[in-house]
């Protein structure tokens, strides 16, 4: 499955991508410099840092080549060599290694490297919801291999986002409410939303990008047996019966199911997952339990990945990057009506 992507500026993005070793299974750009957000002008978009994620089959080989071609992108960790860099990438945080504040084509970029296997694992099971969460929202796909497992996982991740959102929404809701819920999944529990991010970030992402969200989710909603989708009215109705919610809970990614069982199961009872989810399906607070489960995943990965980012970026870049984030948060605060 190829996610929808904007077609303009193809040459610009190609020039940036060509600066790197080309062994990508997936390369995409995301964020406020790629998709306009409410309250940001074209001028702000051009000034914003461009964010990329590169999935690669062999991180050691990729970092080896990138250290030859782009050694200055790395912090002091470059002196450890590609094997140690790859170990830091895979063993800590969310399995992503970021280089930030990199000059390219008269812009500043940040790029994260993740192994294809780790990406597929996150897409299918929501182990960290770090990259999987970014892919719940519209992104610009730059390169995508023919890896069938990856394509299937990308689609599965979108379906999981829809199902999880159904569980947290009322019986009837608007298309915009659904996309707000989906866009907010990967920010739920993220400590950076308390300090360092614009508090209206989720709304800003959705308001100006409804058409991109429709492109991403329309077919899934049309084919989903759990929902009545009325695209002309922009309304949806979902099955909120215990049976319907149980079916949805059983379709959630494995890590989220495990988090839910930890929240609900009493110590020492050791009931199986199916029994616990059946109990949750009958609970009036089912949606709240799902929300807490997602928050626990995101909170853990956001803290550990941010801590790793201090080492991978280096102190000077960390201070500079954090300052830029705080400036964006300040602009968002100033835009709010009194």
UniProtKB/Swiss-Prot annotation:
Superkingdom of this protein's organism: Eukaryota
Pathway connected to this protein: Phospholipid metabolism; CDP-diacylglycerol biosynthesis; CDP-diacylglycerol from sn-glycerol 3-phosphate: step 3/3
One GO term (biological process): CDP-diacylglycerol biosynthetic process
GO cellular component, one term: mitochondrion
Subcellular location field: Mitochondrion inner membrane
Cofactor(s), by name: Mg(2+)
Function: Catalyzes the conversion of phosphatidic acid (PA) to CDP-diacylglycerol (CDP-DAG), an essential intermediate in the synthesis of phosphatidylglycerol, cardiolipin and phosphatidylinositol.
Family of the protein in this entry: Belongs to the TAM41 family.
Protein name: Phosphatidate cytidylyltransferase, mitochondrial
Name of the coding gene: tamm41
């Amino acid at each position: 499955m190829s996610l929808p992507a904007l077609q303009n500026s193809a040459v610009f993005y190609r020039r940036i991508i060509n600066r790197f070793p080309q062994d990508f299974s997936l390369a995409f750009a995301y964020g406020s410099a790629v998709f306009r957000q409410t309250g940001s002008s074209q001028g702000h978009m051009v000034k914003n840092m461009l964010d990329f994620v590169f999935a690669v089959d062999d991180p050691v080989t990729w970092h080896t080549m990138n250290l030859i071609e782009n050694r200055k992108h790395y912090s002091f960790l470059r002196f450890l060599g590609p094997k140690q860099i790859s170990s830091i990438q895979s063993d800590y945080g969310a399995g992503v290694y970021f280089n930030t504040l990199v000059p390219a084509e008269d812009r500043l970029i940040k790029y994260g490297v993740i192994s294809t296997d780790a990406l597929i694992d996150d897409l299918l099971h929501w182990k960290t919801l770090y990259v999987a969460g970014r892919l719940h929202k519209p992104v610009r796909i730059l390169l995508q291999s023919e890896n069938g497992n990856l394509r299937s996982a990308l689609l599965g991740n979108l379906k999981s986002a829809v199902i999880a959102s159904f569980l947290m929404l009322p019986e009837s809701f608007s298309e915009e409410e659904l996309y707000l819920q989906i866009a907010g999944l990967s920010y739920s529990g993220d400590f950076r939303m308390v300090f360092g991010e614009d508090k209206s970030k989720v709304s800003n992402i959705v308001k100006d990008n409804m058409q991109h969200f429709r492109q991403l989710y329309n077919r899934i909603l049309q084919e989903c047996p759990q929902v009545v989708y009325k695209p002309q009215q922009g309304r949806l109705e979902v099955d909120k019966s215990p049976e319907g919610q149980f079916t949805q809970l059983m379709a959630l990614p494995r890590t989220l199911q495990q988090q839910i069982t930890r929240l609900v199961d009493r110590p020492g009872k050791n009931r199986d997952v199916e029994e616990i989810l059946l109990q949750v399906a009958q609970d009036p607070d089912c949606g709240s339990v799902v929300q807490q489960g997602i928050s626990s995943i995101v909170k853990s990965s956001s803290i550990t990945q941010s801590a790793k980012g201090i080492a991978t970026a280096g102190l000077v870049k960390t201070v500079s990057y954090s300052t830029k984030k705080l400036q964006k948060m300040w602009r968002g605060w100033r835009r709010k009506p009194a």
